[in-house]
């Protein structure tokens, strides 16, 4: 009960200020794989908390929580959060391909050290986790056709590896064929719209290019500019809640310069992946391009495009 109350303090306004779903509507839960770079920024912690809150309300079935970041503290932090929300057995995985991004927190307070040091988890370091590619292929092969939503709030490294994978013990299909058969859509916190440079794109430019050009299903982008103006966490750190890794991550970092709240880049993608973009956002169809080796992206509107990007709903 306390966890639910404290999550309401962090997210209630964020997920309800633009509209409410009727209590009589009971859609099937979304089958979700979350792919995160948790570590460079702590908004991933809030995004995972939002995901777990929606799982507790029956709106999402969390199939896996994967790391796109090689940093050794990512998987322990993911497991801390899964365990805190009473889901310690959610499969995890980490990238094994090289080269890949390995990025620690850029905040002075090393919250990625504090969480594993103070809360239970199974895996000592990220490199001990199963191969994210194998986890993807195993889970996708077991799901009904067009039933899985993938939400990436990190780099595209794992998704590139998935697209370029071949048949294995889990499926005779290539990675691209497996995605086309099993995935309903990809929702990604990536890009700056209509053009610019954004962290999740430029940290692994080759992977971003592959996914932008070859992904066979619908992609919905929640760009940097969306979450950049949505601040969360202020009420959370003021609540009388103890022994919460979510509150700890926010409280540790707030002291460094976020007194009014932290930007919610990753929350927006999780929200769209689970609840859809309406009534929170409008979308425009088009094509997404990574136009240079520095990771600059642009967007070309096209009513027949299979990619969408979100913009605030009036």
Where are these regions (language model features)?
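Active-site histidine-anchored catalytic micro-motif
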Residues: 27-79, 121-229
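Bacterial Sec-dependent N-terminal signal peptides
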Residues: 1-27
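Surface-exposed loop and adjacent secondary-structure segments within mature catalytic domains
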Residues: 90-119
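Conformational coupling and interaction surfaces
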Residues: 25-32, 50-60, 201-314
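Short acidic, glycine/serine/threonine-rich loops at helix termini
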Residues: 103-106, 162-164, 233-234
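Short, structured active-site "lid" loops
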Residues: 83-89
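Alpha-helical substrate-recognition element adjacent to the catalytic core
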Residues: 80-83, 314
């Amino acid at each position: 009960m306390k966890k639910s109350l404290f999550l309401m303090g962090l997210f209630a306004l964020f997920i309800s200020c633009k509209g409410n779903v009727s209590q009589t509507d009971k859609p099937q839960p979304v089958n979700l794989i979350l792919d995160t770079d948790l570590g460079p920024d702590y908004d991933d912690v809030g995004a995972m908390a939002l995901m777990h809150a929606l799982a507790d309300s029956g709106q999402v079935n969390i199939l896996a929580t994967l790391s796109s970041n090689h940093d050794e503290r990512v998987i322990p932090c993911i497991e801390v959060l899964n365990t805190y929300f009473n889901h310690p057995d959610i499969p995890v995985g980490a990238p094994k391909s090289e080269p890949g991004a390995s990025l620690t927190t850029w905040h002075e307070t090393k919250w990625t050290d504090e969480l594993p040091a103070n809360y239970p988890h199974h895996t000592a370091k990220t490199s001990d986790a199963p191969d994210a590619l194998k986890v993807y292929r195993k889970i996708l092969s077991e799901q009904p056709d067009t039933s899985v939503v993938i939400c990436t709030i990190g780099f595209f490294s794992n998704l590139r590896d998935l697209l370029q994978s071949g048949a294995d013990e889990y499926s005779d299909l290539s990675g691209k064929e497996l995605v086309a058969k099993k995935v309903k859509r990809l929702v990604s916190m990536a890009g700056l719209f209509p053009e610019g440079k954004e962290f999740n794109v430029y940290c692994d430019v080759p992977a971003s290019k592959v996914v932008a050009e070859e992904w066979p299903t619908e992609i919905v982008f929640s760009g940097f500019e969306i979450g950049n103006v949505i601040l969360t966490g202020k009420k959370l750190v003021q609540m009388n809640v103890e022994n919460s890794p979510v509150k700890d991550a926010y409280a540790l970092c707030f002291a460094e310069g976020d007194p009014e709240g932290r930007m919610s880049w990753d929350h927006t993608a999780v929200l769209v992946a689970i609840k859809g973009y309406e009534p929170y956002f409008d979308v425009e169809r088009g094509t997404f391009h990574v136009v240079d080796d520095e990771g600059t992206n642009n967007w070309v509107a096209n009513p027949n495009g299979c990619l969408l990007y979100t913009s605030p709903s009036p």
